[in-house]
Amino acid sequence: MSVGMAAPRAPYSCDPDRSRGRLFAEPPSRTRSPFRRDCDRVIHSTAFRRLKHKTQVFVFHEGDHYRTRLTHSLEVAQIARALARQLGLDEDLTETLALAHDLGHPPFGHAGERALNRCMADHGGFDHNAQTLRIVTAFEQRYPDFDGLNLTWESLEGIVKHNGPLQGPVPAGIAEFNARFDLELWSYASLEAQVAALADDIAYDAHDIDDGLRAGLFTVDDLKEVPLLAAIIAEIDRHYPSLDDIRRGAELVRELISYLIAAVAGEAERRIEQAKPVSPHDVRRHAGPLVAFPADVAEHEATIKAFLWQRMYRHERVMRVMRDAERIVADLFGRYQQDGATLPAGWLDGCGGEGERARRISHFIAGMTDRFALTEHHRLFDSTPDLR
């Protein structure tokens, strides 16, 4: 089948008419499938809107054209839908998982998560997937009959297990919810969830290249250090010998996304043909993931990540901002712990001990945007780093 063409619904896809349901029973919609309702609920959530002002790599005020968690999530959803369409999967469920996957991230990207995890080291740590689950099952308060978004079982398991079965210690927030609504943490997630996870990898690689070029951290010609990118650039230069670097970079990103989507789709089709699943049940109980990069492409993808690690994520300019961002998160956590009156009224009401107090504080900080975290730091401290 040509890439981009919609395949018929596959028997191993998640069928909305056979969903395992919601924690709180609801009458069916007359106009939308259960998975479409899930997707719409994510889009209309407060947490989703906050992603507009949460960092991907560059802090929110560095430029209007850099990616935020929101634009990244939209791009992941676009890639995920393309893959789902090719494989005959449920596009609405796939989109739900792509849009929801970053809801639990704290401000300042991975720097904020590292800082919050250190602050919570004595209380179980901080995990953004567990935080996402808390958001969609408790923290969003938009409906009269339940807290959270009351998503389907399939959406919840995909949020928790999109990177595979949970092995080793399970974050407390996930374990507690799993005791109420068994998400089969030991098994793989649906193909829709596996697609969303690979789409996240593709989006990261391609769009961090785009942002790094825009920021001047490296050039198109620098990217020739990566063999796969060198081959793509050579083809671009052969077809468009007079193209300026801005358009060369944009064409490189487009071609890379197309190449990776086709590679993942082809590998998934090969694995599915070998495994011969006839239901989502078979997918979940398979010995390994059915959606993945082919081995040679996985090597190329690792090389891209290594380049970005050295030339972008470890760039002194980025590192300086991230160190300051970590300090801001740690400062806020320490001040809130020291003086609970600096938190909004009622935030610590009914706390049962030091661990619960720390967890409440981590929830408050995790919900902040970059901008609000800076505003809070200005309010509580005499000196706040300039994240530029």
Curated annotation (Swiss-Prot):
Location of the HD domain: 69-205
Molecular function as annotated in GO: dGTPase activity
Keyword Aminoacyl-tRNA synthetase (UniProt): no
Position of the signal peptide: none
GO biological process, one term: dGTP catabolic process
Hydrolase is among the record's keywords: yes
Pfam families the record matches: HD (PF01966), HD_assoc (PF13286)
Region annotation Disordered: where it falls in the sequence: 1-32
Record keywords: Hydrolase
Record-stated family: Belongs to the dGTPase family. Type 2 subfamily.
Protein name per Swiss-Prot or TrEMBL: Deoxyguanosinetriphosphate triphosphohydrolase-like protein
Organism: Bradyrhizobium sp. (strain ORS 278)
